[in-house]
Design a protein with these regions (language model features):
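P-loop (Walker A) phosphate-binding loop of NTP-binding proteins
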Residues: 1
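Conserved lysine of the Walker
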Residues: 6
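Hydrophobic positions on the alpha1 helix immediately C-terminal to the Walker A/P-loop
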Residues: 9, 13
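Conserved substrate/cofactor phosphate-moiety recognition/catalytic segment
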Residues: 15-56, 80
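Conserved nucleotide-binding/hydrolysis micro-motifs of P-loop NTPases
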Residues: 26-28, 73-75, 119-124, 175-178
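Glycine-rich phosphate-binding loop used to anchor ATP phosphates in small-molecule kinases
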Residues: 42-109
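A glycine- and Lys/Arg-enriched "phosphate-lid" helix/loop adjacent to the NTP-binding pocket
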Residues: 79-152
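NTP-dependent small-molecule kinase module
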Residues: 125-207
Length: 207
């Protein structure tokens, strides 16, 4: 979920545990995102573009054990379901999307650890307003609330529908002081390190 703290955690894991961050690649040569903001009929081609781009990025990252991702292809379906429920996808388009999604993800390598970041909605909206990105502000509170609600069953979806052996770690980040509280940061890093015992936790001044 946007503004939940994903990038903060990814950067923390990179700096303190030595992971390489796979930057989110955004390919939009046809300006589909901008077209979608002006006319929702572009939702389907836009989301297909995101799905294929994120899938290619995930394949690249999964070739090595050192990469971490801010956002993975697994969560792409959350947006597609939201747009379908909002009437932006036709039934046939949603069916086509699901067929492609299932086909692409059927044989991908499961991540070694999936960190699920939780954050209260009011705190997410406070962060969106605070960082002042106009494109995020312009879509309005109703959109963010719909997306937030769509993300709530996401963990159950991954566990039940994908039928994959994925280890989940849930992290509550509603507290804006988390990253500034050494005891909380250390506890989190130690928990993650249990899944990667070969990694050493670096002190902040060495990161």
């Amino acid at each position: 979920m946007t503004a939940s703290g994903k990038s903060t955690i990814v950067n923390l894991l990179s700096q303190r545990l030595g992971f390489d961050v796979m930057p989110e690649e955004f390919r939009d040569p046809l300006d589909l995102l901008s077209r979608f903001h002006h006319d929702h009929k572009w939702a389907f081609p836009m989301q297909l573009n995101f799905l294929v781009t994120r899938f290619a990025q995930y394949l690249c990252a999964s070739e090595k054990d050192n990469y971490i991702l801010d956002r993975s292809v697994f969560g792409d379906k959350v947006y597609a379901m939201l747009y379908y429920r909002s009437g932006y996808f036709k039934d046939s388009q949603f069916g086509c999307y699901l067929t492609l999604y299932d086909s692409l993800l059927r044989n991908v390598k499961a991540p070694k650890l999936f960190v699920v970041v939780r954050c209260e909605f009011d705190e997410i909206m406070r962060r969106i307003q605070s960082r002042g990105r106009q494109d995020e502000i312009d879509v309005g509170v109703d959109y963010w609330k719909s997306l937030y609600d769509a993300y709530m069953p996401f963990l159950d979806f991954l566990q039940n529908e994908l039928q994959r052996d994925i280890t989940f770690y849930e992290l509550e980040l509603s507290d804006p002081t988390f990253i500034e509280t050494p005891s909380k940061v250390t506890a989190f890093l130690e928990d993650v390190q249990k899944f990667f015992p070969e990694r050493k936790i670096l002190p902040p001044h060495e990161s």
